Regions:
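Flexible "arm" and connector segments at domain edges
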Residues: 1-83, 87-129
Length: 129
């Protein structure tokens, strides 16, 4: 299966693509993949992401662990698949509740920056410990 590349795809464009897909699949698809099931799928994908990260992390280099002998490129591909699946489910859930994921991300970044301000090197040098 070929995946078309979308350089510089915005979150809104991604939401639109998922919305178009879900509408094209119709009511039966929506009924069979309700929001509660979608959250369950999201949790499952987060578990797969955790396994992909552990597989890539050199500190977990147990040669007897499943997937340890897999080439790095395959491990990165698994990570990419997991991230893509998570993003799809986040987009679908956000659409179901009318949440703009871009706006949600910006609000989260503002909260993170308020809690953990980024200092320039000059500010760091001139501040007291």
């Amino acid at each position: 299966m070929s995946v078309e590349s979308h350089p510089q795809l915005t979150i809104r464009q991604a939401q639109h693509r998922v919305d178009t897909f879900l509408k094209a699949k119709g009511e039966e698809w929506t009924r069979l993949s309700n929001h509660h099931l979608r959250v369950t799928h999201l949790v499952e994908e987060v578990g797969e992401l955790a396994r992909a990260v552990i597989n890539l992390d050199a500190s977990y280099s147990d040669p007897n662990r499943r997937g340890a002998s897999q080439p790095r490129g395959e491990k990165v591909a698994h990570l990419q698949d997991s991230l893509g699946d998570i993003f799809y489910h986040l987009l679908a859930i956000s659409l179901a509740y009318g949440v703009d994921l871009g706006d949600a991300f910006e609000a989260s970044m503002q909260n993170i920056l308020a809690r953990y301000p980024v200092r320039t090197p000059d500010e760091a040098l001139n501040s007291e410990p």
